C-alpha cells in the first residue's frame, strides 16, 4: 500500500463490533475504506485467510501492513495514539 493509503475495515452491517469500530473512525475523523464481506465474497475469503478460517469482524488492515481483528476501543486508541 502507498503511504497515503487508508485503513480498510472489513466487516458486516449487522455486527455490533464493526459498527463500534466504524463509529470510532468516524468520530475521530480517520478516513478508511469500508468493505462489507456479506456483499464482497472475495473480501470474505480474505478475512478467513487472515483469521485462520474464521470470518472474524471487524478485521482492519492498516497501510503499514498491521492487522487488528475484533479490536476493542482501547486497541484502536492505542493504534492511533488517542487517549
Predicted ranges, named:
Residues 1-30:
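Local sequence-structure signature of Cys/Sec-based thiol-disulfide redox active-site neighborhoods
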Residues 15, 41, 70:
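Loop/helix-junction capping segments adjacent to catalytic residues or to phosphate/diphosphate-binding pockets
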Residues 22-38, 55, 67:
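Conserved segment of the thioredoxin-like fold in thiol-based oxidoreductases
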Residues 36-54, 66, 81-82:
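Thioredoxin-like thiol-disulfide oxidoreductase module
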Residues 62-83:
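Non-catalytic, surface beta->alpha helical segment in thiol-disulfide oxidoreductase systems
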Amino acid at each position: 500500500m502507498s503511504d497515503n493509503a487508508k485503513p480498510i475495515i472489513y466487516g458486516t452491517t449487522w455486527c455490533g463490533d464493526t459498527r463500534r469500530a466504524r463509529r470510532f473512525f468516524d468520530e475521530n475523523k480517520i478516513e478508511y475504506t469500508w468493505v462489507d464481506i456479506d456483499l464482497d465474497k472475495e473480501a470474505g475469503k480474505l478475512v478467513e485467510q487472515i483469521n485462520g478460517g474464521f470470518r472474524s469482524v471487524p478485521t482492519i488492515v492498516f497501510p503499514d501492513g498491521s492487522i487488528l481483528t475484533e479490536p476493542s476501543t482501547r486497541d484502536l486508541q492505542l493504534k492511533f495514539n488517542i487517549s
